[in-house]
A protein has these predicted regions:
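N-terminal hydrophobic/helix-forming segments and targeting peptides
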Residues: 1-260
Length: 260
């Protein structure tokens, strides 16, 4: 019986038992590059831009309709800055088959609404809606970065990235203090933090003078100085809040990767 079991049964093995020392070193080297990619690719646009740069370094050229294609030619096609196709031209017709590998570059996140900015209780916020199947309670009281693009009235596309560098400000979705949350903690995990409650805190200092929405005005003034943005430009912007944590190694043996 043992003989036929060993022949027919599948016995899972630890992957580290299946590689030698040289392969282990290669795995570590690859993962360090992967961590660098994750740190600089927080959105689809950033992932695609970084992938294009890597492709160019490896001999890929942008595909143009009508261009000459020969076996071995490496081409890429970027779809609206958010999707990427890479191809290596083969020797035979597609009728003979092709090897296709696919992957997604989007991830759960908190997006800004089209008219997101408002002031209440002398604090300024961005209204948001979440993308993907997030656990909403994981997104409160953690530092967040703002990534994306805005299209100004003159058609200029402005890249925005705030909070990635150590000396830049970050943002937060607030939560109740423990001693004020007696009713909240009785709710289920899905109900404790609502989608409507995921509002991004972005400022608290008022613009000098008198009148309404002075904190909102101060924040808008700062954004206008930095990027030339007015409130109307948010209608044609695509901005997302993502965790402001660097990717890191997990465990005493550094064998796992943790990060967004």
């Amino acid at each position: 019986m043992d003989e036929i079991k060993s022949k027919l049964f599948y016995e899972p093995k630890n992957g580290y038992d299946l590689i030698d020392a040289a392969e282990h070193v290669a795995v570590e080297d690859y993962c360090r590059g992967y961590m660098d990619f994750l740190n600089t690719s927080r959105t689809e646009r950033e992932a695609v831009a970084n992938a294009i740069a890597m492709a160019k370094e490896n001999g890929f050229v942008e595909f143009r309709p009508g261009m000459e294609l020969r076996p071995g030619t490496k081409v890429y096609y970027c779809n609206r800055g958010k999707a990427l196709i890479l191809a290596v031209i083969g020797k035979h017709s597609l009728s003979g088959g092709a090897v296709i590998a696919g992957a997604h570059v989007d991830a759960p996140r908190v997006d800004l609404k089209q008219n997101p900015m408002y002031e209440t209780d002398e604090l300024c916020y961005f209204r948001t809606h979440y993308y993907g199947g997030i656990k909403k309670y994981q997104w409160v009281t953690i530092p967040l970065e703002l990534h994306g693009v805005a299209v100004l009235k003159d058609g200029t596309v402005v890249d925005i990235c705030i909070g990635r560098e150590p000396d830049e400000p970050r943002f937060v979705i607030t939560d109740l203090l423990p001693h004020l949350a007696q009713e909240q903690v009785k709710k289920t995990m899905a109900e404790g933090i609502t989608g409507e409650g995921l509002q991004l805190l972005i400022g608290s200092v008022p613009y000098a003078g008198e009148g309404k929405d002075r904190v909102k005005l101060a924040v808008l003034s700062t954004l206008n100085d930095m990027y030339g943005i007015t409130e109307e430009d948010f209608l044609s912007a695509e901005l997302a809040a993502v965790p402001a944590f660097d990717v890191c190694e997990i465990g005493f043996d550094r064998s796992l990767i943790g990060g967004y």
